[in-house]
Regions:
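Short amphipathic helix-loop junctions that connect adjacent transmembrane helices
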Residues: 120-136
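Helix-to-loop junctions at the C-terminal end of transmembrane segments
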Residues: 23, 150-164, 248-249
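C-terminal transmembrane helical hairpin of 12-TM major facilitator-type secondary transporters
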Residues: 163-209
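A membrane-interface helix-boundary motif in multi-pass transporters
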Residues: 23-41, 244-268
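Pair of pore-lining "gating" transmembrane helices in MFS-fold secondary transporters
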Residues: 97-122, 196, 200
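Juxtamembrane intracellular "pre-TM" segments in multi-pass secondary transporters
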Residues: 58-106, 128-129
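Glycine-rich segments within core transmembrane alpha-helices of 12-TM secondary carriers
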Residues: 1-23, 44, 232-240
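Multi-pass alpha-helical transporter architecture, strongest
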Residues: 45-55, 182, 239, 253, ...
Length: 286
């Protein structure tokens, strides 16, 4: 999971700089956003072609759905928010493991709900308060990406098994002052100090929670478990920016970031309680 996180961080380094370069070179045109969008679309197509050509389907033919219609009804359970939060599609787990997944999934959802919203509002804040240009915002994300890559490459992949929740707690606790500092920052130096704390949380929380969840279930269940887990993250990322932007434009950046930062106390408390309730390792499934 740390290697996946490093790959994500590298994309976080290169992507914003490419977008900023496009925006600056095309700023004289009224539709400067079209070329970056087409470039991203082309990369996605190339990625799909690469996957098709280099990866083989792991599901044996005899276990695949016989028709699209027969699998469509089952797919609906993977987009129902309530079924996702309760991990209902996951079958044949012990009650203890199922409850642990539900708690971890809910914590992950809350964390990304608050995180994605404040992350989305960051461009508004830097433009309104510091008059950052597109290139300056790209450089800002470049620095954050470098910090994330260093944290994941030098620290996260060395975390011993069983310590994921402890590191995750540290990451969420760190992001509380991070967003508060960003919200009240009046100089670029203060902003970047908050961003470095933000980078630590960004580089630790999601990889550690994903690693923790991946320990549950048997070989035939892990795909479903991780798929539901990632779907919860996507749902949070869909709702978070809307909620955060509403507060940002209604009450201002200071209130938005202070309240948003304090909201992270909720997943900290829930994760701490879950840590106390867990004892031993997940059940081994075959």
């Amino acid at each position: 999971m740390a290697l996946i996180g490093i790959a994500f961080s590298l994309g976080f380094i290169v992507g914003p700089m490419i977008g900023a370069q496009f925006a600056m070179s095309l700023k004289a045109t009224s539709q400067f956003y079209i070329i970056p969008a087409l470039f991203a679309f082309t990369l996605a197509i190339v990625d799909i072609i690469f996957l098709i050509c280099t990866f083989q389907e792991s599901l044996p033919p005899e276990k695949r759905a016989h028709s699209i219609a027969s699998s469509f009804s089952g797919a609906l359970s993977y987009i129902n928010p309530w079924l996702l939060l309760t991990f209902k599609p996951v079958q044949k787990l012990s009650l203890r493991d199922h409850e642990a997944l539900q708690k971890c999934g809910f914590i992950y959802f809350l964390y990304l709900l608050f995180y994605s919203g404040l992350e989305y509002s960051l461009c508004f804040l830097t433009h309104d308060r510091f008059q950052y240009s597109r290139m300056q915002q790209g450089k800002m994300y470049f620095v954050v990406g470098l910090a994330m890559a260093a944290i994941q490459g030098g620290y996260v992949h060395r975390i011993p098994p069983g310590k994921e929740i402890k590191v995750c707690l540290l990451g969420i606790v760190t992001i509380i002052p991070s967003f508060i500092i960003i919200g009240i920052s009046w100089t670029p130096s203060m902003l970047y100090f908050g961003l470095l704390l933000y980078a630590f949380a960004s580089g630790t929380v999601v990889p550690c929670l994903t690693t923790f969840v991946s320990k549950y279930g048997g070989p035939t269940q892990k795909g479903t478990i991780l798929g539901i887990f990632r779907s919860l993250g996507a749902l949070a990322r869909a709702l978070g920016p809307f909620l955060s932007a509403t507060v940002y434009w209604w009450a201002g950046p200071v209130v938005c970031y202070i309240i948003g930062g304090c909201f992270f106390v909720i997943p900290v408390i829930l994760l701490r309680n879950m840590q106390k309730c867990l004892s031993g390792q997940p059940q081994v499934y075959t």
